[in-house]
From Swiss-Prot:
Residue stretches spanning the membrane: none
Organism listed in the record: Arabidopsis thaliana
Name of the protein described by the UniProt record: bZIP transcription factor 30
Lineage: Eukaryota, Viridiplantae, Streptophyta, Embryophyta, Tracheophyta
Subunit details: Interacts with WUS, HEC1, KNAT1, KNAT2, HAT1, BEL1, and NGA1.
One GO cellular component term noted in the UniProt record for this chain: nucleus
Region (Leucine-zipper): 398-433
Compositionally biased spans, kind Pro residues: 51-61
Length: 519
């Protein structure tokens, strides 16, 4: 059994060295001491734990009862592209302390239940897997595993600036997503005094760095805000990571947890569930409630854009904004975010819109949770301003039209009064002309009557004057001519006077008509 364990340790060390030795990383490297002699010496401390049976523990997952038979499995090897980071960049790999809740499944399966098949995590990177007795030579469970999928703790420059790790009890609750106080107490009650004597400060320091790198979500937001140089490539990367995340992440819902991420081969690679089992509220390391609209992406080692990051210098943390950028006035003191970003979610804002958002506190609060709603609000405001401007312009045009119509009405009223005066003058002139016509008709009738009388008188005179006797007739004719001549002269004079009076009346009427027309 001891020889088989040493051979397994040597093979796993060769695989780690072959996968990490050829990688080129831009981050500063630390010495990673994986000493086979140290691991072999740890086998001497497993016998005290295998002498007495451990207390019974409730099963963690459906896979805990799988018989230890060699079955085919599909797992991703550790020879993935390691240009993103090297194992040399991690802090010294020491055995994890029993009080640190790496994973309930890992602790119970590796340190207490020899019959459970250990995971690659406990076989390769945790010395606690050497205490599993006969179970250390058993193959891993049949499942689809990712080895180095979520690498977010290898940033040495981040870990130097992180805060202190939270209490271990809160970490255990956040990891399991349910009430695991009984299991954590069981794990804490069995310290391995022989091996950890004198090493506990180093172990706690290393695990504090690991958990601090996980729990400091503000630094992880920097990775989430990286969108890539090309928009299409960035969207493809996001979809790829979200699909891989959806297929293998742990979900805590009412106490049930999936162990598809349990076999991560990196040291201290703990999947911390950020959702509460009762209310589903996301929480940070310090206990404050994070915004509900935020979406965190896992940093996959096989993502095509991870080779472009340079975690060595702090300038690489200032990444271009992407679909997960946010606006938060509280981030002004963190140094890794500006006052406002140009892009929120899938909505892009112009400089004028950013000024409006900065001026309005409500919009600044809403834009963190729902940037599309802020976009709609700004669009509604712009449309309302345009409609108001159109209404104002329309009212001004109507007022101008009213003024024009009023001036036209006054002009038309003046013209109407003038036309009324003209019509009155024409009516008077027409009446005068009628009177003149009647007078002329009367004069014509008088002339006709006078001419008839003259003709009758001539006939009568012819009858009276006969020729009984030419002599007498000659003498009488001369006397009659002398007597008739005065009468004829009188009638002619009367007719002439009447004719003159008619002409004078006509002249007077024409003068009056001309005078009225001139007025």
């Amino acid at each position: 059994m001891g020889g088989g364990g040493d051979t397994t340790d040597t093979n796993m060390m060769q695989r780690v060295n072959s996968s990490s030795g050829t990688s080129s990383s831009s981050i500063p490297k630390h010495n990673l001491h994986l000493n086979p002699a140290l691991i072999r010496s740890h086998h001497h401390f497993r016998h005290p734990f295998t002498g007495a049976p451990p207390p019974p523990i409730p099963p963690i997952s459906p896979y805990s009862q799988i018989p230890a038979t060699l079955q085919p499995r599909h797992s991703r090897s550790m020879s993935q592209p390691s240009s993103f980071f090297s194992f040399d960049s991690l802090p010294p790999l020491n055995p994890s302390a029993p009080s640190v809740s790496v994973s309930v499944e890992e602790k119970t399966g590796a340190g207490f239940s020899p019959s459970l098949p250990p995971s690659p995590f406990t076989m390769c990177h945790s010395s606690s897997s050497r205490n599993a007795g006969d179970g250390e030579n058993l193959p891993p469970r049949k499942s689809h595993r990712r080895s180095n999928s979520d690498v977010t703790f290898g940033f040495s420059s981040m870990m130097s600036q992180n805060q202190k790790s939270p209490p271990l009890s809160s970490l255990e609750r956040s990891i399991s997503g349910e009430d695991t106080s009984d299991w954590s107490n069981l794990v804490k009650k069995e310290p391995r005094e022989g091996f950890y004597k004198g090493r506990k400060p180093e172990v706690e320091a290393a695990m504090d760095d690991v958990f601090t790198a996980y729990m400091n979500l503000d630094n992880i937001d920097v990775l989430n805000s990286f969108g890539g140089e090309d928009g299409k490539n960035g969207n493809e990367n996001v979809e790829e990571m979200e699909s891989s995340r959806g297929s293998g992440t742990k979900k805590t819902n009412g106490g049930s947890s999936s162990d598809s991420e349990g076999d991560s081969s990196a040291s201290g690679n703990v999947k911390v569930a950020l959702s509460s089992s009762s209310s589903g509220v996301k929480r940070r390391a310090g206990g404050d409630i994070a915004p509900t609209g935020r979406h965190y992406r896992s940093v996959s080692m096989d993502s095509c854009f991870m080779g472009k990051l340079n975690f060595g210098d702090e300038s690489s943390l200032k990444l271009p904004p992407s679909s997960s950028a946010k606006v938060s006035p509280t981030n002004s003191g963190e140094g890794n975010s500006s006052a406002y970003s140009v892009e929120f979610g899938n909505s892009e804002f112009t400089a004028a819109e950013m000024k409006k958002i900065a001026a309005d506190e409500k919009l600044a609060e809403i834009v963190m949770a729902d940037p599309k709603r802020v976009k709609r609000i700004l669009a509604n405001r712009v449309s309302a301003a345009r409609s108001k401007e159109r209404k104002t312009r329309y009212m001004a045009e109507l007022e101008h039209k009213v003024q024009t119509l009023q001036t036209e009405a006054t002009t038309l009223s003046a013209q109407l009064t003038h036309l009324q005066r003209d019509s009155m003058g024409l009516t008077n002139q027409n009446s005068e002309l009628k009177f003149r016509l009647q007078a002329m008709e009367q004069q014509a009738q008088l002339r006709d009557a006078l001419s008839e009388k003259l003709n009758e008188e001539v006939q009568r005179l012819k009858l009276v004057i006969g020729e009984p006797n030419r002599r007498q007739s000659g003498s009488s004719s001369s006397e009659s001519k002398m007597s008739l001549n005065p009468e004829m002269f009188q009638q002619l004079s009367i007719s002439q006077l009447q004719h003159q009076q008619m002409q004078h009346s006509n002249q007077c009427s024409t003068m009056k008509a001309k005078h009225t027309s001139n007025d």
